[in-house]
Amino acid sequence: MSNTWDVIVIGGGHAGCEAASASARAGARTLLLTHKRETVGEMSCNPAIGGLGKGHLVREIDALDGLMGRIGDKAGIQYRLLNRSKGPAVRGPRSQIDRKLYREAMQAELFSHVNLDVVAIAVEDLIVEDGVVAGAIDGEGAIYRAPRVVLTTGTFLKGVIHQGEIRISAGRVGDAPSIGLADRLYALGFDMGRLKTGTPARLDGKTIAWDRLEMQAADEQPEPFSFLTTRIDVPQIQCGITYTTAETHKIIAERLGESAVYGGRATGIGPRYCPSIEDKVVRFADKTSHQVFLEPEGLDDDTVYPNGVSTSVSAETQLLFLRTMPGLENVEVIRYGYAIEYDYVDPRELYPTLETKRLPGLYLAGQINGTTGYEEAGAQGLMAGLNAALAVQGREPAVFARDEAYIGVMIDDLVTRGVTEPYRMFTSRAEFRLILRADNADQRLTDRGLALGCVGSVRAEAWAAKKAELEAVRAFARSVTLTPAEANRTGFKVNHDGQRRDVLAMLALPEVTLDRLATVWPQISTWSPMAREQIAIEAAYAGYLDRQRDDVEAFRREEDLRLPADLDYGLVGSLSNEVREKLARVKPLTLGQAARIEGVTPGALTALLAHVRRAKAA
C-alpha cells in the first residue's frame, strides 16, 4: 500500500464515515485513519437516528448518496414519523437503531468501498509544510501523505470522562483521547474552546418490569430514511416509558455535588436541548416528574438505553435514583453513565467548504466544530470529504445556500455565528422550511450531487425514473381543468367565478381529495403513492410556496453581492471597532453572510456595500 493519497480522513465516527465515502465516491484516492477498525460506525451515545430537523439532514445526506440513511434502514428497529399530525415541512423521520446491525453494515460498506483504504492507527500529529497541510503522522512516527486532510475527532480531543469523583482521560469509555492533535491545533493558533456532553447508564433489560410500563409501538407503516429503500425488513419493537419521581429528584438534589458541572470539576458547556438529569432537577425545580424512554439497543441485545437521564454523578447514586422509577425498582446496570469534556475549534475558523482559514488543505467536521448529534456530524463529514476531493481535482467547491438545504443552514450558522454551546439542528433554524422538506430532499439535491460526482449509478437510475414520473404527473395535473359548472356537476362545491381549475387548484379546496378527483380523471388512480403525496403537498402549500419563493429571491439578491476575500475592513468608513473585528474574524463571502453576523447593523451593511461599490468603480 502506498503512503500517498489524495485525501486523508482522521476518525471513524459518523462524520468520518461520511467524509471518507464522499471523498471516495467523488473519485479521490482516500485513506481513513481510525484508532480501531472494530469501532468504525459506532453509535457512541443514543441508539437512534433522525428526529425533528435531524431527519431532514439524514434525507439530505441520502439525496447526495451518503451512507447514514441506507445503513440506518438496515438497522432500524422502531420507526416513527415525528410531528405526523403537523404539516409536511416539520415532520421528522426517526428510528431506534440496532447498534450491532448498524456498525456491521457501515463497516461492510466502507471496508469494501472503491477508492478507500482503512487503516487502524492513532494519529498523533499533522504534517505541515510551507504553511499547508501535507498529511498525518501516527504514534509510531509512520507518515501518511495527502494534500487534503479531514479531521473528524468527535469527543477525542483532550477528552476527559467525569463520573462522580472519578476523572479519566478518554475519548469515550475504553478509548484513549487524542492529545497530540489537540496540541498541534493549539500550536497552529486555532481559537479553541471546551464543550461537554453526557450519556446515561445502560440498563439490563432482563431486570426491567416491562409489564408495569406504558409501551410505545412503532408506526404501522415505517417511513424509511433512504429514498432507495422500498421496504423495511428489520423486525420492529416497542419502547417502554417511565418517569422520574419526587424521590428521584430528592436523591439527585442531595448529591448534586457529585455532578461534574455542579461539583465544579467540569467547565465545558453542555447541550441545551439534551440536558443531564441534574440540569433538569435544577433548571426545572417546579416539575415533579420527567419522562424517560427505555430504548432497547438491539434485537438480540438485552441492553436498554434510558433516554432522558444522562448524568455524571457517581455509580452508587445512579443506581439509587434509577431504582426510584416505576418498572426499574430492581434494575441492574450494565454500564454507568458519565459526562465527557472535549476540545473544539471555533467554527468561525472555517470557510463554508469546512476548510480551515488558518491552515489550507485542512477540513474539520463533526463535534470538533461544536455540533452535537450523529446527523449533524454525518452531514458535515459528507460536505468536508466532498470538498476535499473536489479541491484535489481543481474543481469548484460544493456549498449549499440556506434556501437549498438544511446542510446549508447548519454550515452557515456555524461559520457565520460560531457556537457557545453544542449546536443541534431544528426545523426552526431554517427560514425557508416550506421548501426544505424531508420529503423533497432528493428533488432539491440529487441533481446537484450528480453534477458534483458524488452520486453513484444505482441512485442516478432510481432518481431519473422518479424525476420522470414526477414531471409527467405534474404536467398532467396542470393540463386538465374543470370549469365551475363542470366541477359542481361532478359534486364539487366551487364558486361560479369563471375560473378554470386544474388538479392542484381543485385539491386546495376543502374536502377535495385525489381519490375524489380520480372519479373525474381516472389517470390519477394510476399514480404511485409517492407521486400522490407530492402533488397533495404541493397543492396544500401552493400559495405559501409562492410567497416563500419571493423571499428566496430577495435572499439571493443579497447572497449574490460578493465581498472580496482580501477586503480590509479597516478601510471601511462608519464601522465601529466591534463590527470591524467581527467582520475580519468571519471574513464573510457575501453581503448576506455579513448580515447574519451578530452585531452587524443595517448601517454597517450600507457602509460596507458603498465601500465595495466604490472600490469596483475605481
Curated annotation (Swiss-Prot):
Listed SUPFAM superfamilies: FAD/NAD(P)-binding domain
GO BP terms in the entry: tRNA methylation; tRNA wobble uridine modification
Residue sites binding NAD(+) per the record: 270-284
Subcellular localization(s) per the UniProt record: Cytoplasm
Quaternary organization: Homodimer. Heterotetramer of two MnmE and two MnmG subunits.
Cofactor annotation: FAD
Keyword Transmembrane helix annotated: no
Protein name: tRNA uridine 5-carboxymethylaminomethyl modification enzyme MnmG
Origin organism lineage: Bacteria, Pseudomonadati, Pseudomonadota, Alphaproteobacteria, Caulobacterales
Organism: Caulobacter sp. (strain K31)
GO cellular component: cytosol
Role of this protein: NAD-binding protein involved in the addition of a carboxymethylaminomethyl (cmnm) group at the wobble position (U34) of certain tRNAs, forming tRNA-cmnm(5)s(2)U34.
Location, primary (coarse class): cytoplasm
